[in-house]
Amino acid sequence: MDELLIQDPEVGRAIVQEVERQTGKLELIASENFVSPAVRAAQGSVLTHKYAEGYPGKRYYGGCEFVDVAENLAIDRACEIFGAQYANVQPHSGSQANMAVYFSALTPGDTILAMDLSHGGHLTHGSPVNFSGRFYNVVFYGVSRETGCIDYDSVAELAREHRPAMIVAGASAYSRIIDFARFRAIADEVGSLLMVDMAHIAGLVAAGLHPSPVGTAHFTTTTTHKTLRGPRGGMILSDEEAAKKLNSQIFPGIQGGPLMHVIAAKAVAFGEALRPEFGAYQKQVVANAAKLAATLTDAGFELVSGGTDNHLMLVDLTNKDITGKDAQHALDLAGITANKNTVPFETRSPFVTSGIRLGTPALTTRGMKEAEMVKVAGWIIDALGNIGNETRLAEISRDVEKFARQFPLFHW
């Protein structure tokens, strides 16, 4: 960092300020996490210099013998973690992993049945502003108005009516266990392929705390950050039968040279996921989410589906007459980072929203447990009760900073 501050003080100062933000605030964005020093070391290594188009043993460039080692380790460890026959670790993101699956199995104009974004889905699951919504005919399923949980009977009815070429399961803001076996049964009934995007829950799946889609779905995609606690990137898991098509869709289909420094960092993170400590960490993530959810519920906050089974919760602020936008801003002033989020059957725009999404992976990585979640919930409640009161929000922020700095960014 000293060298960077000398060579490029503007970028260096921005990074120093970001370190201060991360250490002095409470990170509750459900899709964010903190990686280990080992993962950061791999990602910042000389592997960033190397072009390696192709796959291990079949490169279009020379000098790839050592990056091949890194990629093979990432592949082997991913397959071991999830019990998969095949893994492609080259996708630069979860979005590109999803794109490769679509391109390998579908034709433009085919019908996809996927979860509505406002009910907890993802942009790449058919949103009209995304490539997936432009290339394919998308039919959406959602959650029950009564329970806030996926309405599997409705999914089955929609599948029978529309006969989709592919059903997509997985979400970015859904707090309950997803029944992948039920999705596969529906897919089989109508002759559809099933893709599961487990980006948010991959770490829980790795630790056996959520049913695995691998072996149930035809294709499983994920990011490698979030609960999996690796570098930002994507991955595809499937069987040997699909390998050739998937490989060719990643390269040369939608990507050129893979990011070998990121792939090495993925290998390191996957190695960490095979350690017993990783399972203990994931259990704590779930326990922390349950405690945070229960404390907020006891204070009169309404959670979509009534609670959480995983690492996140979706707080519906309608009964508090607070918008997600205002809540996010107030929390930020109080030293707590979260994101506004649409809720099922949303009445406000995506730029305003009626909810906020909260997650515990990052705080758990810092070493926080249930007792700390009660404190965090107290500050959230205080901040949301003082929207517009900048004096009180500043006081909360000072308390939050003093508390947060007691914890390192990464703790086993």
UniProtKB/Swiss-Prot annotation:
Could you say which protein family the record assigns here?
Answer: Belongs to the SHMT family.
Named cofactor requirement(s):
pyridoxal 5'-phosphate
Keywords, comma-separated and alphabetical? Amino-acid biosynthesis, Cytoplasm, One-carbon metabolism, Pyridoxal phosphate, Transferase
Named in its record, the pathway it takes part in is: One-carbon metabolism; tetrahydrofolate interconversion; Amino-acid biosynthesis; glycine biosynthesis; glycine from L-serine: step 1/1
Q: Which reaction does it catalyse?
A: (6R)-5,10-methylene-5,6,7,8-tetrahydrofolate + glycine + H2O = (6S)-5,6,7,8-tetrahydrofolate + L-serine
Classification via InterPro entries:
PyrdxlP-dep_Trfase, PyrdxlP-dep_Trfase_major, PyrdxlP-dep_Trfase_small, Ser_HO-MeTrfase, Ser_HO-MeTrfase-like, Ser_HO-MeTrfase_PLP_BS, SHMT-like_dom
**Residues that coordinate or bind (6S)-5,6,7,8-tetrahydrofolate:** 117, 121-123, 349-351
Q: Name one Pfam family in it.
A: SHMT
What this protein is called in its record is Serine hydroxymethyltransferase
**According to its record, what are the GO cellular component terms?**
cytosol
What biological-process terms (Gene Ontology) are attached? glycine biosynthetic process from serine; tetrahydrofolate interconversion
| UniProt entry tagged with the keyword Lyase | no
| Keyword Hydrolase among record annotations | no
Site keyed Plays an important role in substrate specificity: positions: 225
GO terms for MF: glycine hydroxymethyltransferase activity; pyridoxal phosphate binding
Subunit and interaction comment: Homodimer.
* CDD domains per the UniProt record, alphabetical: SHMT
Q: What does this protein do?
A: Catalyzes the reversible interconversion of serine and glycine with tetrahydrofolate (THF) serving as the one-carbon carrier. This reaction serves as the major source of one-carbon groups required for the biosynthesis of purines, thymidylate, methionine, and other important biomolecules. Also exhibits THF-independent aldolase activity toward beta-hydroxyamino acids, producing glycine and aldehydes, via a retro-aldol mechanism.
- SUPFAM superfamilies documented for this protein: PLP-dependent transferases
Q: Where in the cell is it found?
A: Cytoplasm
The EC designation for this entry is: 2.1.2.1
Question: Which residues does this entry mark as bearing N6-(pyridoxal phosphate)lysine?
Answer: 226
Instruction: Look up and give the organism this protein is from.
Output: Oleidesulfovibrio alaskensis (strain ATCC BAA-1058 / DSM 17464 / G20) (Desulfovibrio alaskensis)
